[in-house]
Amino acid sequence: MIMPTASELIRHHHAHPLDFESVREVPDSHAWPDLHDHPTASAQGAVVPVIDLSATATNVLEQLARACESWGAFQVTGHGVPPGLLRRVEAAARGVFALPTNRKLEAARPADGVSGYGRARISCFFPKLMWSEGFTIAGSPVDHARTLWPDDDALAFCDVIEEYKEEMKQLARKLMRMMLMSLGLTEAEAEAETETGWIGPGDEAGGMSAVLQLNSYPVCPDPDRAMGMAAHTDSTLLTLLFQSNTSGLQVLQVVGDTGRDRAARWVTVPPMPGALIVNVGDLFQILSNGRYRSVIHRAVVNRTSHRVSVAYMCGPPAASKVEPIVKLVGPGSGPVYRPVTWPEYLSVKGKLFDKALASVMRTEVSLEHT
């Protein structure tokens, strides 16, 4: 599934990752001075919601609304993705990152491309580098797979990736419908949005676009000085994340009202066997007219376990405008955000990063918030 024109718009930092196996200490280039910008909640404290999608529909919709309004993220069980497929896609990801560095660099992401091996694209927004490496798959994985492995191994890798992408596509469409219904749309209205509206069946000519991102967080000799993935929001509708059995994902929970009582803390999302994590993306925040907020999240590293994660990042067709759903715009208040395409928003995010959402607010709304 190809995201048209995105390769022309995503031109972020593309330098090669560090050869992590060759270093015994964190170099200054990767030493972060502000890892503790917010406190981290204790393991017995706040918990990111877990939602069983096989439960009663009404109950699930209520839970989705609370999770999206309060957290912008949640874990799902009862999603129907075979556990064996999750194990195989984790093994496929580990197989990529276990290759020698010189082999991985043969599949390096070009400066003007989307797919391939390299650093996180958000690297250019930070003065320090991250303790991670990534492999992005937009469209078919065949070309890069043949660069990395002999034909039989490449075919096996591609089979797993394509099967996983298909499962994620179906789950993403299901979640989109349910989340729209949790906002107050009827089943017919949600169905119209996901089947006949701009979120269509999901082929190249129309429907949801998607990119699959494999992430690697190698063992770190000094995790208190390194950052796996810096804090950010996703430029998507939804991101479906499989984080295997090693913790590292943290989401930022804002507690209290505005003013002095307002505070934020990092909450670790514990791995759950077979569960998937759902992040609300920037585009869904626009779609919901700001009711559901995209979640700020990051990844921390550890000194004992090599962590991998697999993120399915989905959005609308490149030519489709994303704007607040009319039914969600209150009388007399107007939409908070102006219409924007996914490529247009990626271009804005590539320049403004964490100020991108504010930049697509309507002028009169922006003035009210200044």
PLM features: what roles do these ranges have?
Residues M1-T370:
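Peripheral, non-catalytic segments flanking oxidoreductase cores
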